[in-house]
Amino acid sequence: MKFTVLSLFPAIIKPFFENSIMKKAINKGIVSFELVDVRDFSKDKHKRCDDLPYGGGAGMVLKAEPISFALEHVESAKKTTIFLSPSGIKYSQELAYSLSKREEIVIICGRYEGIDQRIIDLYVDFEISIGDYVLSSGEIAALVLIDSVYRLLDGVINPNSLLEESFGVKNGLLEYPHYTRPYDFKGIKVPEVLLSGHHANIKNWRLVKAREKTKKNRYDLYLKYLEIIGEDNGFDKKN
């Protein structure tokens, strides 16, 4: 998969591709990337890419021309173009799985008040929000999306990890608690079942704890889980 990022500040993005698991994925040929500096496509002598909004209001808006030139520079018939914005559809693990099946993802990083709507109308396949909050940097949102997608690609991480983690394809629950050495930390001991070696009991304990955590922290996901399994198995639907 190729990630292409259009940004006014590509230096924010670059280190992510040069470290840790992402670097290994690139070395294996699983992932490639291109960083496009939108300023390089500005016709303004000062390389400005923003202007005042029509209709008035606070802040500046990214101009259509440099972004359109940058997008046309990215030659690929198989690209999926994404603009990250608080006004977009809410991002989810399900959408991350869907995007992981694409061949190339092009991400437009927003700044200031946003971008000219005509870019969204003409070029964007998905306008996505990573949550109900506002960031000053679209680059941070881009890193969230990239990280959530590339880790789902074959050969990046252990596929069994994807089954058990939060929002996993197995059941959609939040992940169960984890413990490691020491056995006793400040008077809190590791649950005995995890030391028993009894795999069926451990599996059942983890499911129970995952359900409890999901019910407590994300009741919406818990109700969705109950709909999927078609029963509550003793877990009532009341708060």
Curated annotation (Swiss-Prot):
One of its GO terms (cellular component) is cytosol. GO terms for molecular function: tRNA (guanine(37)-N1)-methyltransferase activity. S-adenosyl-L-methionine binds at G110, I130, G131, D132, Y133, V134, L135. It is found in: Cytoplasm. InterPro entries: Alpha/beta_knot_MTases, tRNA_m1G_MeTrfase_C_sf, tRNA_m1G_MeTrfase_TrmD, tRNA_m1G_MTases_N, tRNA_MeTrfase_TRMD/TRM10. It catalyses: guanosine(37) in tRNA + S-adenosyl-L-methionine = N(1)-methylguanosine(37) in tRNA + S-adenosyl-L-homocysteine + H(+). It is an enzyme of class 2 (transferase). It comes from the Bacteria. GO terms for biological process: tRNA N1-guanine methylation. Its main location: cytoplasm. Keywords: Cytoplasm, Methyltransferase, S-adenosyl-L-methionine, Transferase, tRNA processing. Transmembrane segments: none annotated. Signal peptide: none annotated. The keyword GTP-binding does not apply. Pfam families: tRNA_m1G_MT. Its EC number is 2.1.1.228. Belongs to the RNA methyltransferase TrmD family. Homodimer. This is tRNA (guanine-N(1)-)-methyltransferase. The gene is trmD.
